[in-house]
Amino acid sequence: MAHKIRFGSHILPGLIFLIGCLGLLWGITNVARGATSDALFDLEAKLLKFETFNRTTAATTLDGTTARDLEACDTHSQRALLLLEIPLADAALRSGAVQEFDLRSGALETRAQQTLSCAPRDSLVWLLLFGLKNEHGLLDERTFDLLKMSYETSPNEAWIAVRRVVVAVPTILSAPEAVRELVLAEFQALVRRGFVETPALAYFSASPQVRSMLQSRLDQLDASERAGFTRAVEKLKS
C-alpha cells in the first residue's frame, strides 16, 4: 500500500487542478443532498469553470442514492462525480488514510471506465485515467496511450489543454517520443494563444532538464508571445 502514497504525491496535485482546486481554499458552495441528474449536469459546468465545493457535501453527493443509481451513460453527471471524487482522494492521500485513498481511487477508475464505455471520445476522462495510472507509478507505454487518447480526442480545445499541460509536463522524460512531442507542442501552442497561467505553472514546477525542453519551445516564439508567459512565471516567484 505504501508505494501508492509515494507515487501519489507526484501526480494528484495535477489531477486536483482538473477541478480548479490548485492554490485555492475549498469554497463554501454546497451541493444539495438530494442531487438530481439535472443538478449534477449544472455541477459539472461549475466545476469545469474552476469553482470549488465543500468536501463534506462532495462526499455526501458521492455516497448518496443518486450517485449510486446513476445510469452509466449519463455522462455529464458521471463526469461531475469524477470531478468531485478527485479532491477526496487527494485529502485521503495527504492525511495518510490509505484505506479511504484506495477506495476513492478505485471508485474513480471504475467510474471513468464506465464513462468511456458510453463516451469514448471524452478527453477529460482519458486524462484522468492517465493521471490515476501515473499516480500508481505505472508510466509504461499503455499508460501513455491513455494520454495520447486525450490529445487525439481534443487536439485543439483550450478548456482541456490548460488542464492537460499541468498533468502531462511532469511525465515528459518518461514519455515515448511521439507523446513527448504532443506535450511540448501543446505547451507552446497555449503560450502562443495567450493561455499562459497553466503553462507557467508547469514550467515553474519543472526539473531543470524538463524546463530546458520547455524553454526550447519558448525560444521559438516571438517576444510579444513570450511576454505574458514571463509575467505569469514572475507572479509565481513572488
Residue map of PLM features:
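Hydrophobic membrane-insertion alpha-helices, especially the h-region
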Residues: 9-31
